[in-house]
Structures are given as structure tokens and as C-alpha cells.
Amino acid sequence: MSFSEDSDRWQQAVYYFTGYDAPHIDKLFTEWVGNDDIPLMKVELTKQSRVTYVDVDDLQWRVDNAGRGVNNTDFVIPFYKTGNEEESGKDAAGDQVTYYKARFTLLGNHNGKDRPTGGVYEGGENKAKYDNDFKKSDEGTTWDTGPHTQYSYGTGRALEALLDNDGGTRGFEWNGLDVPAERVVDLASFARAAGAFDRVAQFYADRQAVLEEWHKRVGMEENDAWKGTAAGVFWDLIHTLGKRYEDYADDLRKGAMFSVPGDAIRIAGSVFQKEARKLQQHWARWEIKDGNPLSFVSDLLSEIVDHVWDTNITNITYKVHTAARGETRTTYHATGNFRQDAVDKNGKNYGPLNSLDTWKAVGAAAIERWKKSVKENLVDNADLALRAVHDAWSPSVFDVGTIKTSSGDSLSQDYEKDKADKEKKEAEEKAEKYRKEQEAKEEKYRK
């Protein structure tokens, strides 16, 4: 498999976009097993009491499961075998064969009254209900498809909730797995945040106009007589607020209705929503076709049946033996091209047809094929979506502007400065008056 829990961008992206924390990819199939830890299916190998030609009804499941639907979860693969239980069958030409049937029951949901295989369903723990083809001791087998459905179907449904529901993923739950309140994602929050900045910008613009009118009434320049007095403090207040509100309005406003931060947030939210929609669409196409791993099991078993037909079932002959009394007996034998291994269309050999380890490997291979589909259809596209949002929200693109406070002293500092200026001016005026008085006295004495 080309990705794992750490690199599962689909699981990570859905968590990031919706707050829905789906099970990790490595945990989906640990409890979805049959006998002998065979993934996704139960298998029983039975040696038949006599050798005969294959019953075509045993292969009807291939017709039932044509396409992507799994209408029949009860499969039979008939095959012939030479030698003892361990021999592979190579160089078996002429050897007498015995007749076996590998009986399969796929564990999970299928077409019919339960639900369409290619659609969404909630899984969970199940208990086997087998007919007499399987041993009574196997009837207690249980398996759990819950983690798989939480991953395969819950993730897509969480994206749909984000995009379509008022409140986003608030209250969302799939098969017992919910989005807690602290992780809820609501697309409307972008509009609310942007609107808040718009209102703040409008507030400063409106108040700045009011303060400017007040400023005109009290004078655009401070009256020297007011310095160091309550009137001076009031003038400083109007002047400082007017300047700061003017700066805030200039920094925040964008046009008559909007704000710089508000527009940046709206653009970021638009990119977020667009990428979430893409993910939901990729998922919708994938789940109807490849969401159910049982379709991959059916496909792989069909490939193996093709090989069994070509190299096993159609490669036997028979001999008729006549006893002294005229009684006849028929035996069946392998021809030169006879083989008895499970091989897929790519030539991969999973082992002898009569070994449960072989079918365990087949189940594991079907899971890997399903994961490959997840990688190509979900994981890769999720990586692109996360990159797109990251780029749109990077500091170089997500520019909320710069909101600065004009430099200036506090009102108390302005008051102390005005008071000091006033005292200094009074001292200078007093000194100037004293100087002039002294000059006048000197002039009088000279006369």
C-alpha cells in the first residue's frame, strides 16, 4: 500500500474541513474477518465424495455479481487436485485427481433488500447466518464493518453536512461517531466574521464623521487659554478620537459597504467551501463504484476462477476401467497443462487452491486493491484540496490589512504637557514683563 495512517490525507482533510475524526485506515479491517483470520470472507474447503464434471450452477455467482454490484455473497469455486494435500500440482500430467469445492461467504452488505452495494450504509457488528454448507461450529462467527463504514461513508456524509446543513457539522453523527461541539465547522462563520469587520469599519467611519463635526465646533486648533484646563482635556479628547477613528476607518473600509479584513475572510471562506465541494464530489463518484471492498473480493475471485477454468477445470480427462466381470469404473486425470494454484489476471500466485492461507492472502490482496482506489480517488485529491486552502490562507495571500493606532499621548499626558506648556508660557511672559519693567526703570534713571 502506498499510504498509511500518517499519510492518509483523506482522513486528515475531512477532520480539518468538518471536525469528523474518522477511524484511521490501518484500523478498518482488523475486526472484519471470518474463519482463520481470513479478511472479508468465510472459506470452507470440502473434498467431494466423488469426482465428476463441474456443475455450472456453482459459477452462477459470476453472473449475479456482474458489474459493481454484489448480489450474491455465497460463492463456490470448484477445482480438481492431484496428489496429497501439500502437493502443488506441477508436473501432474496423468495423475489421478480428486474433486474439491471452495465455498465462500462474503461478510458484509450486498444488493437486495438490505441496500445497494454501491451506496452508503451504516455498518456494525454482525453474526454469521450460514446454511448447511458450513459447519455448525462456525455459526457464531462475528465481524464488524463499523470502522470501515465510518471511514468510507461517514467522511462523505460529514462533508455533505458541512455544505448543506444549517449549522454545518453541528449535531452530525455517523454510526456512533459524532462531531463534538468544540470541533464543529460551520461555513456561515466566515460570513459572520466578515460581517463583524464590516460593521466595525462602518462604526468607525460613522463616528469619525460625528467627531469631525464636534472638532469643527470646538475649533480645529486648540485655544491657548484652554491648555492645562478641563476644556483643553476635552479638546484633546475630540482631536485624538477623531484622528484615531479616521485612521481606523481608512485602514478597515473597502468601498461603501465592506471592509478589508471582511473581504479577505470572505475570499478565504469561498476557497474553503469550493475545496470542500470538490472533495464531496470526488467521494460521491468513488463510493458508488468502489466504496464497498466486497466488490474487489468478487472481482479478484472472478479472476481466479478464470485461471482455474483455463488451467484446472478444462484440463482433466478420464479413463474407463473394465473389470473381468465386465464392470466399469471411471477415473479422472490431469492433462499436461493442469495447474492447481490461485492466480489472478496479472499472474500473481496466491498459493494452492486447497489452502486456507491462500484465501487469506486473496482477502488481504482485495483490501490492498480497495486501498489503492482510496489513494487514487480520495487521498490524492484531498492532498490537492489541503494545498489549495493552505495557499489561499497563507500570509502572502490572506491579507486582512494593517490596523494601526495613531501615535500620540494619553489624555493625562496631554493634560500634563498642556499644563507644562502653559506654566512655561506664563513664566516666559512674566520674565518678559519683568525685563521690560527693568528696561523702563533704567531708561527713567538715565533721563
At which residue positions do the language-model features occur?
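Long, amphipathic alpha-helical coiled-coil/dimerization segments that form elongated scaffolds
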Residues: 196-331
